[in-house]
Amino acid sequence: GDWVKSTMSLIGGAFGLVGSITYLYLIFIRSSRKGYQKSRTTKKPSSKLVRTFCGPVTAVVLTIAMLAGETVYLVYAMRATRAEATASSQYISVSAHRGGARKAPENTMSAIKYAVDSMSDYAEIDVQETSDGEIVLMHDTNLKRTTGLNASIWTLTYDEISQLDAGVRFNKKFRGEQIPKLEEVIAYAKGKINLNIEVKYNGHNQNIVKKVVKIIEDNDFVDQCVLTSMNYNFLRQAKKINPDIKTGYTMKMSYGGLEDMDAADFFSVKYTYITESFVEHAHSLGKEVCAWTLNYQGDMQRMVNCGVDNIITDDPELVRKV
């Protein structure tokens, strides 16, 4: 694999470095002897320029330059080898963001089906509560962006929401796509794909965690999902109801104090704030790191090198190419 090639390059660089040091040493020894012999039989060059650029001084300068270059190469080779060895030994799971929002209307059944077809490990979805207590898939608190209706989700019943078109604004071929209930999505996903269920806090859904956990338990789906939220108190509630539910704390930044976050089994962090040291610290606490939301190969490769455990993306097929 690539990491084997990097290791061979690393070994070659090490031999080159040793060789350069040896060569530099021999140059000094040889120059010292010749200088001593010539000083007894010949005159020194009258020009300082000639003395500087003729003979051993030039060789020494060139050797030092080569030595510096090989040292830099060796450092970079060591870092690349470590990163590639880590990447080759660790499986990184893939989550389709909102089901795969680049290929289908977000948080719809079509998006979940795409996540399955793209062989994603997880479909990441967002859930909120309607005015009559139904748990549905929706990211925004306002329905305008995805359905065209300028209304807050907590002001409408499920019957009213079910009449809205959640697909046509994405593409006409998805005309008639409905906003699904969490139960519908779980029923379809069972045995096909895991779900990352992000519980949104909007100030109007204080009992949403209890309802979401009940739906998960009633459908025997605990082992096939994780529950995440930016509201840490929601994670506490979930763990209190059912300690077996795997929970993740969604963060826009990589905060400190990870040791105190007992209600979180893993951390879901915006990729721009993830560093290798953060991942190592989380892993030392026995907690995984999920990176969101990546849609470019360069960013994905950096996260692979950092050692993250899961990548959330709108384009899961692209991640497999990294």
Short names for language-model regions:
Residues 104-114, 180-185, 209, 250-260, ...:
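Short, acidic/polar
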Residues 139-246, 264, 269, 283-285:
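Metal-dependent phosphodiesterase/phospholipase catalytic core, i.e.
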Residues 27-47:
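Cytoplasmic membrane-interface regions of multi-pass membrane proteins
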Residues 53, 74-81, 249-322:
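C-terminal active-site rim and adjoining tail of enzyme catalytic domains
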Residues 94-96, 123-125, 195-199, 225-228, ...:
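Hydrophobic faces of well-ordered beta-strands that scaffold small-molecule active sites
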Residues 74-124, 128-131:
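Membrane-interface segments at or immediately adjacent to transmembrane helices
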Residues 41-79:
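Internal/C-terminal transmembrane anchor helices
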Residues 1-34:
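Hydrophobic alpha-helical segments
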